[in-house]
């Protein structure tokens, strides 16, 4: 058998796993791998990011649309440590990515060699699994294991740290390498719990379905729709659950959470049975835990056994994949008329519309509002674009007002709330979905954290539409300081550079929008452009995002103003 280097074995292993794109940044300790990658240019597209954090976020965006792990490769030391924020982000949101980092030679480990960093020790808390390869013979098996772990059970990030000597030494490549299937926890009472869940839902007077990111991760959108239609159940999404059920669906009642819709939050505490599936009851959704859903019998379904009964005790806790569970539960469900109960949600919608929505979506004078920008984008794209939102007020506005009609249409940083996520994530999303319209909605603060990825967009000739909602402030922090810190605005005002000149430097067509009359025509030009386009839209400086559940308050204490 012909011998090949560890770096060549790595490339062969990645090709075996179906890898067609790598986001990366070369350096000393990973150069043998990049040399091997040179021979795979026809099979693997390498995207040269401008910062290693961008590689991790791009891999996340790619994974969200491709439905398979995104892959990033960087060098040792600062290259590897720069990945950590992106890895932690993927861990929080259950995004499967495979990170490969170079490392100093095995003989130099522990000597404080140039660009040595204890990567395995650093990333262990924020990965599903990580491993350091010191021998080329390990490569084939370890890569297979990494992809298996990243995509099985609750998905998430894995990291392979490969020493330089393992990259250069020769080995006999084992092309048949397979990983041992991970043992899953078998619940002997699963069928009994399934029937109990069905009985609770069939007998409920005020049933309520809450769904999260687990629906999209399990590819269970069709099963969710059939289930809620069979039972006539009102259904609400978490932030990351958005687009798993079309917003236009008559049984979709809105978004949960701190800046979610009025009805879904207000009526949580009036439901008598709640089915929570593919969500983990994080603090943005529950509000004050002791006051959460006091009248409800809760059925909690999650792929991660550790999430069950972790925050909110469940009457029935079921460890299951969302797709499998819904497919088995739906035949047991009886259709009932819950129109009176759903009517309560619609009454809340009317109140929210009167107090908040109309003012935000259709301001009659003054500065442009964030909401009207999102409304126009939604109308012009018919709710079918991929919205990649950064973190802050604009994230909540995009979630609330874009009319998602197509699955896998909202990509954002949920659990970690990483500013700077959107621009690099949109790179990965566009490469995974080249035929889909990808629109990055970003705040002026977030944009400046990763704006160097405009260079990646330029070099890769990607068509990404970028909208900066520019309020010259760190808007969400400013809102909290206004509401809860006696208007003591501590370091939230931003003196920004000329974003249009920056876009010019990257050869990206752009416009500055200050006047409402100019907004719609500019959006038309942006959306019809063949390549990338940037709009810097000046929005109201002191605009607040409502509804809002104050920190520490119960969900039914949600405020409209």
For the regions a language model picked out, list residue spans one by one.
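Structural signature of the thiamine diphosphate
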Residues: 20-21, 64-75, 80-101, 124-176, ...
């Amino acid at each position: 058998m012909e011998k090949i280097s560890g770096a060549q074995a790595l490339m062969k292993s990645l090709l075996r796993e179906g890898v067609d794109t790598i986001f990366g940044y070369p350096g000393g300790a990973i150069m043998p791998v990049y040399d091997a990658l040179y021979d795979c240019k026809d099979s693997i597209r390498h995207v040269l990011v401008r910062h290693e954090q961008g590689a991790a976020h791009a891999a996340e965006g790619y994974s969200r649309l491709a439905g398979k792990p995104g892959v990033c490769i960087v060098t040792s030391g600062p290259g590897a440590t720069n990945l950590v924020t992106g890895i932690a982000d993927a861990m929080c949101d259950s995004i499967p990515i495979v990170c490969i980092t170079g490392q100093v030679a095995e003989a130099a480990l522990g000597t404080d060699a140039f660009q040595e960093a204890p990567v395995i020790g650093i990333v262990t808390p924020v990965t599903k699994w990580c491993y350091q390869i010191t021998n080329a013979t390990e490569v084939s098996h370890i890569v297979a294991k990494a992809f298996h772990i990243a995509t099985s059970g609750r998905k998430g990030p894995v990291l392979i740290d490969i020493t330089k000597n393992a990259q250069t030494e020769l080995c006999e490549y084992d092309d048949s390498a397979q990983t041992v299937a991970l043992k899953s926890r078998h619940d002997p009472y699963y069928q009994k719990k399934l029937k109990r869940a069905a009985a609770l839902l069939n007998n409920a007077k005020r049933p309520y379905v809450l769904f999260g990111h687990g629906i999209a991760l399990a590819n269970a959108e069709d099963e969710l729709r059939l289930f809620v239609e069979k039972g006539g159940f009102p259904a609400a999404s978490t932030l990351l659950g958005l687009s798993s059920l079309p917003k236009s669906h008559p049984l979709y009642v809105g978004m949960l959470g701190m800046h979610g819709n009025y009805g879904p939050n207000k009526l949580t505490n009036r439901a008598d049975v709640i089915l929570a599936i593919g969500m983990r009851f994080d603090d943005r959704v529950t509000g004050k835990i002791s006051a959460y859903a006091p009248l409800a019998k809760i059925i909690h379904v999650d792929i991660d056994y550790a999430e069950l009964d972790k925050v909110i005790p469940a009457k029935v806790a079921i460890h299951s994949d969302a797709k499998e569970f819904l497919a088995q539960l739906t035949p047991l469900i009886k259709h009932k008329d819950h129109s009176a109960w759903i009517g309560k949600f619609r009454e809340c919608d009317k109140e929210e519309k009167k107090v908040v929505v109309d003012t935000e979506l259709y301001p009659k004078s003054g500065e442009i509002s964030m909401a009207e920008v999102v409304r126009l984008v939604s109308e012009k794209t018919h709710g079918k674009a991929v919205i990649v939102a950064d973190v802050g007020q604009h994230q909540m506005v995009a979630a609330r007002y874009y009319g998602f009609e197509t699955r896998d249409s909202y990509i954002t940083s949920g659990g970690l709330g990483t500013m700077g996520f959107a621009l690099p994530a949109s790179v990965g999303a566009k490469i995974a979905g080249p035929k889909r319209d990808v629109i990055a909605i970003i705040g002026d603060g977030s944009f400046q954290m990763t704006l160097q990825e405009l260079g990646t967009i330029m070099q890769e000739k990607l068509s990404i539409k970028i909208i900066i909602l520019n309020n010259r402030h760190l808007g969400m922090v400013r809102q909290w300081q206004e509401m809860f810190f006696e208007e003591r605005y501590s370091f939230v005002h931003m003196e920004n550079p000329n974003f249009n000149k920056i876009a010019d430097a990257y050869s990206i067509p752009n416009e500055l929008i200050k006047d409402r009359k100019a907004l719609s025509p500019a959006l038309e030009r942006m959306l019809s452009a063949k390549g990338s386009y940037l709009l810097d839209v000046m929005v109201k400086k002191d605009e607040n995002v409502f509804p809002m559940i104050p920190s520490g308050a119960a969900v039914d204490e949600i405020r409209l103003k």
